[in-house]
Amino acid sequence: MTATLILLLLAQVSWAGPFQQRGLFDFMLEDEASGIGPDERAPELPDLDMLGPVCPFRCQCHLRVVQCSDLGLDKVPKDLPPDTTLLDLQNNKITEIKDGDFKNLKNLHALILVNNKISKISPGAFTPLVKLERLYLSKNHLKELPEKMPKSLQELRAHENEITKVRKSVFSGMNQMIVIELGTNPLKSSGIENGAFQGMKKLSYIRIADTNITTIPQGLPPSLTELHLDGNKITKIDASSLKGLNNLAKLGLSFNDISAVDNGSLANAPHLRELHLDNNKLIRVPGGLADHKYIQVVYLHNNNISVVGANDFCPPGYNTKKASYSGVSLFSNPVQYWEIQPSTFRCVYMRSAIQLGNYK
């Protein structure tokens, strides 16, 4: 009985037609003469839109970060994933940013365009970037800052360009801005419109170093805590230069041509803690240091200071309400250390914090 059943099963298998496994594109390999019957439909290709965003050719995409740096690109790639939050295009050969280059990138938070050849940015190029917080344009060929930057912007870095003008209109309504970097540009004082930075209520950090400005920009916002103007051609600090900077904590004026600091200048920055005036042309210690309550670090090395008075740094009858100095540099000045009275540094925290000598 069992043998009979097995024979019947084998007979059914031998009578059955050959099994054909059809793949997705097998219809392309069939005999063209057979065609498609009236009741048959060709297999449908998958909808590419259902597969999600596609990474631009040669770029790398991971966790909403699109990296297209160092690829020799001469324009912004097309069809960038709309969920991109960081786009890195640095070290390419892009010459122009056009309207539509960043369309649909409403979630972009950071845009890196450093070290390209950008000389032109269309007025509406950044309009779609409603959430952009960081814009890096350094090492390009821009002559002016772009118009209509996103109001959400918090950090702008555009050093090492060819910028000669900073218009007030560029920063109009930029109430979220915190950091601005404009160093190493052929910028002159006349090129900075008066009050260009004034309306930005959260602005905390400005760096305009290694340019051709001869004065401290006017109309700086009171929110500023750090101002770096090193390596310029500033000749003097007027009584009004720091007016209104009540929150300024760090002031960098190294490597300028400053020969005088007007009395009362430092009083306009009552919370100043660190002052860099090294590598200038000062002939005396700036007035007002002894009366300054919070200042702790003063760099005055490489100047022409020949005399240091007993009360230049500390008030008479030093009281503990003034913060102690943690650093005072006077080396590479004509004044000899033995000519300075020991009591001059009575409000310095440690003697090792005082740097003298080495003048040639």
UniProtKB/Swiss-Prot annotation:
Any Pfam family: LRR_8
Listed PROSITE patterns: LRR
Main location: secreted
Chain positions of LRR repeats: 74-94, 95-118, 119-142, 143-163, 164-187, 188-213, 214-234, 235-258, 259-282, 283-305, 306-335, 336-360
Keywords assigned by UniProt, alphabetized: Disulfide bond, Extracellular matrix, Glycoprotein, Leucine-rich repeat, Proteoglycan, Repeat, Secreted, Signal
Compartments reported by the entry: Secreted, Extracellular space, Extracellular matrix; Secreted
GO BP annotation list: negative regulation of angiogenesis; negative regulation of endothelial cell migration; negative regulation of vascular endothelial growth factor signaling pathway; positive regulation of macroautophagy; positive regulation of mitochondrial depolarization; positive regulation of mitochondrial fission; positive regulation of phosphatidylinositol 3-kinase/protein kinase B signal transduction; positive regulation of transcription by RNA polymerase II
Cystine bridges: 55-61, 59-68, 314-347
Signal peptide range: 1-16
Domain of life: Eukaryota
Post-translational modification comment from the UniProt entry: The attached glycosaminoglycan chain can be either chondroitin sulfate or dermatan sulfate depending upon the tissue of origin.
Glycosylation sites: 34, 212, 263, 304
Prosequence residues removed at maturation: 17-30
Gene Ontology MF: a single term: extracellular matrix binding
GO cellular component terms attached to this protein's record: extracellular space
Quaternary data: Binds to type I and type II collagen, fibronectin and TGF-beta. Forms a ternary complex with MFAP2 and ELN. Interacts with DPT.
Function noted in UniProt: May affect the rate of fibrils formation.
Family: Belongs to the small leucine-rich proteoglycan (SLRP) family. SLRP class I subfamily.
The protein, known as: Decorin
Organism lineage: Eukaryota, Metazoa, Chordata, Craniata, Vertebrata
Annotated gene: DCN
